[in-house]
């Protein structure tokens, strides 16, 4: 097998694996994961500088490469 053919098959396999691993549900791509700001439980948003609007967040703290956002009374 030539090196070109091997690289082509590697790229095709990688694209197929990436498409299967991507979430199909729109809601899955828009929600965060649980996190903690000290004693307060929040939602972690990856690669965000500030909390997204429309979710009722009143506070946040920095986490590695993202934000942990929490609503009032959490």
UniProtKB/Swiss-Prot annotation:
<dbReference type="GO" id="GO:0090729">
    <property type="term" value="F:toxin activity"/>
</dbReference>
<dbReference type="GO" id="GO:0005576">
    <property type="term" value="C:extracellular region"/>
</dbReference>
<comment type="similarity">
    <text>Belongs to the sea anemone type 3 (BDS) potassium channel toxin family.</text>
</comment>
<keyword id="KW-1220">Voltage-gated potassium channel impairing toxin</keyword>
<protein>
    <recommendedName>
        <fullName>U-actitoxin-Bgr3b</fullName>
    </recommendedName>
</protein>
<dbReference type="InterPro" id="IPR012414">
    <property type="entry name" value="BDS_K_chnl_tox"/>
</dbReference>
<keyword id="KW-0800">Toxin</keyword>
<keyword id="KW-0165">Cleavage on pair of basic residues</keyword>
<feature type="disulfide bond">
    <location>
        <begin position="35"/>
        <end position="68"/>
    </location>
</feature>
<feature type="propeptide">
    <location>
        <begin position="22"/>
        <end position="29"/>
    </location>
</feature>
<keyword id="KW-0528">Neurotoxin</keyword>
<keyword id="KW-0872">Ion channel impairing toxin</keyword>
<keyword id="KW-0166">Nematocyst</keyword>
<dbReference type="Pfam" id="PF07936">
    <property type="entry name" value="Defensin_4"/>
</dbReference>
<keyword id="KW-1015">Disulfide bond</keyword>
<feature type="disulfide bond">
    <location>
        <begin position="37"/>
        <end position="61"/>
    </location>
</feature>
<dbReference type="InterPro" id="IPR023355">
    <property type="entry name" value="Myo_ane_neurotoxin_sf"/>
</dbReference>
<feature type="signal peptide">
    <location>
        <begin position="1"/>
        <end position="21"/>
    </location>
</feature>
<comment type="function">
    <text>Potently and selectively inhibits voltage-gated potassium channels Kv11/KCNH/ERG. Acts as a gating-modifier toxin that shifts the voltage-dependence of ERG activation in the positive direction and suppresses its current amplitudes elicited by strong depolarizing pulses that maximally activate the channels.</text>
</comment>
<dbReference type="GO" id="GO:0008200">
    <property type="term" value="F:ion channel inhibitor activity"/>
</dbReference>
<keyword id="KW-0732">Signal</keyword>
<keyword id="KW-0632">Potassium channel impairing toxin</keyword>
<dbReference type="GO" id="GO:0042151">
    <property type="term" value="C:nematocyst"/>
</dbReference>
<dbReference type="GO" id="GO:0015459">
    <property type="term" value="F:potassium channel regulator activity"/>
</dbReference>
<feature type="disulfide bond">
    <location>
        <begin position="51"/>
        <end position="69"/>
    </location>
</feature>
<keyword id="KW-0964">Secreted</keyword>
